[in-house]
């Protein structure tokens, strides 16, 4: 095989392109290296949201969707779109797995868990409403809804809207009621902070909340009086306490896996030891989508789509060595999601996980673990082992979600020196670099419509910076074009399954 030019892909998570705004952390940051590289090399912007990545119109992108599209080299129709279509066409209520769960609940109860918002990143309220209606129509006698509040992929204090819409749906379904409310910070942790998950678990399983309210709206009002935004609302029981009983059925309505896994482990894994608690013997426990190989025994309503000849698989088939590296918060994205939602590690694929700092929120340590990630990248480049290195820097997204503007500025400033070290090392090794992002976030830190911090993702385009030979970047691209561009940089033909195209016109 001819000599392959090594490449480095840097994914700056949540680092969107936006030219205006006093609330743009990137514009306010001191990033001389980033500015110089943009001037010196070929720079463009690409699409990372909506139909360009297999999402509905108006829906911003996210890390899972972004890395799926990047790794696949094609538009991947997302689960939210598949489920939306089934609801619209009337097929949702006849889904075999959902039917099984409702059947099992006829003599007991059906528990519906999920993130209640229209954020569209981890879940969508419309799916929860549709399941409530389906269960009512199927004659399920007791339908219990456990709502996780958002405030991260939605404005920090927006849950009133979603709770009111849930109340409207419940009003049409006399067998259903809301029984618990808690913020996603507790119920949807993904960093093994079991001290967060435990109070949410005890509320769900034993009906023992830290607080109690008669309605979801009352619970929210009390939480706001405690100065808790939606994400941080503490475990609150609603109405008469409800316990999960042996034989009950449960459906977890989050379609994104990473923040649903820990709670699912606590509820279903006999070997779970994160904390001591009663574990119900469910008659049926289903998940809306696959939560991964470790949960393969659980029924799934929407099985994953098989992606053949994505970037990782294709490089492996060519006998090339590749490295994936990220800190904890984004490690699943450069591995599991980049590989098309597959747990498999391909031959020749190495992985490095750098622990994220143990802080309550990342505005308290905006540099996160970027320095250590960079150390590992530089060492990997200098080792000469790898033809391709794929890295995610979490800062822009994780600190952007905090809504703290000054911290977001520091977060992206911390990346500037990291970028310089990576680029210098790769150029010295005779390689080339591509810098992009999976979606926007920290380029918009204030929500003018709601007059509060902007903590969610955006639909803005993202950077596409090629550092190597003289070139121009073609306009109109999207995340699906990143892998074909990398293959062009390496001098390799792209597989037929990749429908994206290289955006780099070498001069």
UniProtKB/Swiss-Prot annotation:
Its cofactor is Mn(2+). InterPro entries: Alkaline_phosphatase_core_sf, BPG-indep_PGM_N, Metalloenzyme, PGAM_B_sf, Pgm_bpd_ind. Pathway: Carbohydrate degradation; glycolysis; pyruvate from D-glyceraldehyde 3-phosphate: step 3/5. CDD domains: iPGM. Transmembrane segments: none annotated. GO terms for molecular function: manganese ion binding; phosphoglycerate mutase activity. Mn(2+) 2 binds at residues 13, 63, 438-439. Its EC number is 5.4.2.12. Monomer. NCBIfam families: pgm_bpd_ind. Belongs to the BPG-independent phosphoglycerate mutase family. This is 2,3-bisphosphoglycerate-independent phosphoglycerate mutase.
